[in-house]
Amino acid sequence: MGSTSSLYAAIDLGSNSFHMLVVREVAGSIQTLTRIKRKVRLAAGLNSENALSNEAMERGWQCLRLFAERLQDIPPSQIRVVATATLRLAVNAGDFIAKAQEILGCPVQVISGEEEARLIYQGVAHTTGGADQRLVVDIGGASTELVTGTGAQTTSLFSLSMGCVTWLERYFADRNLGQENFDAAEKAAREVLRPVADELRYHGWKVCVGASGTVQALQEIMMAQGMDERITLEKLQQLKQRAIHCGRLEELEIDGLTLERALVFPSGLAILIAIFTELNIQCMTLAGGALREGLVYGMLHLAVEQDIRSRTLRNIQRRFMIDIDQAQRVAKVAANFFDQVENEWHLEAISRDLLISACQLHEIGLSVDFKQAPQHAAYLVRNLDLPGFTPAQKKLLATLLLNQTNPVDLSSLHQQNAVPPRVAEQLCRLLRLAIIFASRRRDDLVPEMTLQANHELLTLTLPQGWLTQHPLGKEIIAQESQWQSYVHWPLEVH
């Protein structure tokens, strides 16, 4: 199928379930075509050393083989696959992801908890009506996301290490549904919540929205029992008493609760009761969408408001007193170079965005010291929270900044996994050249240049006589040409 396809797919490799959403873009909105969900319970396969068992990984791969069949009809640029808490935690996540990528034929991104929370919120903002100021709660298999925001804008983002699968293994391992099991699970959840409760309450909300399987299950129970859709603490306590009355997990029967959801329902319920109690939530409704919808709307660029990446870059520039004019100057030169070689090198739009982001932050190391500025820059970017960027993208930015000047460390460019190694090399070459030609820090001193790519050979053409008139510039370019040749990047300058 050609790249003009209007189909988009989002896959969420969760700790409890794997989900696939396939949609069609229709007049600036989305129409859901397919939703596939499989209980994989990946988190249950983690041992005490945080290694995933072979059985859990095989369950995951088996599910992805089903998804892969549907993905064949969709252009890879219109597919996003993200992995969350369990694969953030697992020491052997790389093994699972390598095979997952092979099965699906597209990249799998392990996203940070904050990025997961942001995407969930975006999904809610795009799909859920009601008041503008909201609190979003998503109880996953191994993490729980809590986000406040107004409109499309988040005001606080938290990803907490508790989920319905991990709490099941920890507090309901004996499969007893006793008062003491619930008490222990709720107490532990409240302790996890306590450090973030004040900030969430400070930002406040007019409406509380739940975006998880636990909340979906509650909705189904309430519908089956003829109740209204509003979830309240009173209803949660009634359901807890009903579960305790059943006595054992395998004997849990509640009207409207499906067998599929029953296993993790008590642990999810305990976490939700703790959230209601700790945050004094009056009532909650089910969200119209969450993580997968956030992914889809992000691909469609149907932003509700501003681009979070741009805001992140602006905040970092201000915080580290980066010369914004110079950052823009380098970005402009880099964008010009990129546009001249993108067809020959088959570069994608996301690569351009990441190159520009690297330009915006390239002088951040100077805030520490001129000596070893590239190393300082790489360290800062690797360790700063950068909302809007995945961990893999952060690593790529850090690697580009590490290699912005001096001899190239090729192995570092190959160790990032945001883009293919060859693309990382190409972006690095463009960044280095842009920095050199913008180094005089004045727009009128940036020469008119053409850059041509022929496979890996770059040919840079400067104005007649420029090299003669700029002896220092000539020396710097000769040195750069030599450094690039050391790593087999041919560069010719005329």
Curated annotation (Swiss-Prot):
Superkingdom assignment: Bacteria
Protein name: Guanosine-5'-triphosphate,3'-diphosphate pyrophosphatase
Broad enzyme group: hydrolase
Pfam families registered for this protein in UniProt: Ppx-GppA, Ppx-GppA_III
A GO biological process held by the record: phosphorus metabolic process
Activity control summary: Requires Mg(2+) and a monovalent cation, with NH(4) preferred over K(+). KCl, NaCl and NaF salts inhibit the exopolyphosphatase activity.
Key word Hydrolase present: yes
Organism: Escherichia coli (strain K12)
Pathways involved: Purine metabolism; ppGpp biosynthesis; ppGpp from GTP: step 2/2
Function (record text): Catalyzes the conversion of pppGpp to ppGpp. Guanosine pentaphosphate (pppGpp) is a cytoplasmic signaling molecule which together with ppGpp controls the 'stringent response', an adaptive process that allows bacteria to respond to amino acid starvation, resulting in the coordinated regulation of numerous cellular activities. In vitro, can hydrolyze pppGp. Also has exopolyphosphatase activity, catalyzing the release of orthophosphate by processive hydrolysis of the phosphoanyhydride bonds of polyphosphate chains (1000 residues).
Extent of the signal sequence: none
Keywords: Hydrolase
EC number: 3.6.1.40
Example of a GO MF term: guanosine-5'-triphosphate,3'-diphosphate diphosphatase activity
UniProt similarity note: Belongs to the GppA/Ppx family. GppA subfamily.
pH note: Optimum pH is 9.
Catalytic activity line of the entry: guanosine 3'-diphosphate 5'-triphosphate + H2O = guanosine 3',5'-bis(diphosphate) + phosphate + H(+)
